[in-house]
Amino acid sequence: MARVNSLKCALCFIVLILFVQLNCIPETRVMAVELSRVFLQTSSTDCGEPCVYIPCTITALLGCSCLNKVCVRP
């Protein structure tokens, strides 16, 4: 029983550290991604799908391609 409680306590502690790290100290994030439209070209249309980890899969059928981590249609 003591082992279960210690594992549960360790898991809660890890979750607490991650919560504090992601919400209270944003400079420590592993990967900061800027998905704003400021970096998009003005002649392109946003397709509504990010391509941070996986390239444009669904919207590729519409002719969208990845540009600055956002799927856009030229």
UniProtKB/Swiss-Prot annotation:
Comment on protein domains: The presence of a 'disulfide through disulfide knot' structurally defines this protein as a knottin.
Pfam families reported in the protein's UniProt record: Cyclotide
Signal peptide range: 1-24
Family as reported in the entry's similarity comment: Belongs to the cyclotide family. Bracelet subfamily.
Post-translational modification: Contains 3 disulfide bonds.
InterPro entries: Cyclotide, Cyclotide_sf
SS bond partners: 47-64, 51-66, 56-71
Proregion positions: 25-43
Keywords: Disulfide bond, Knottin, Plant defense, Signal
Keyword Glycosyltransferase among UniProt keywords: no
GO biological-process terms attached to the record: defense response
Protein name: Acyclotide phyb-K
Source organism per UniProt: Petunia hybrida
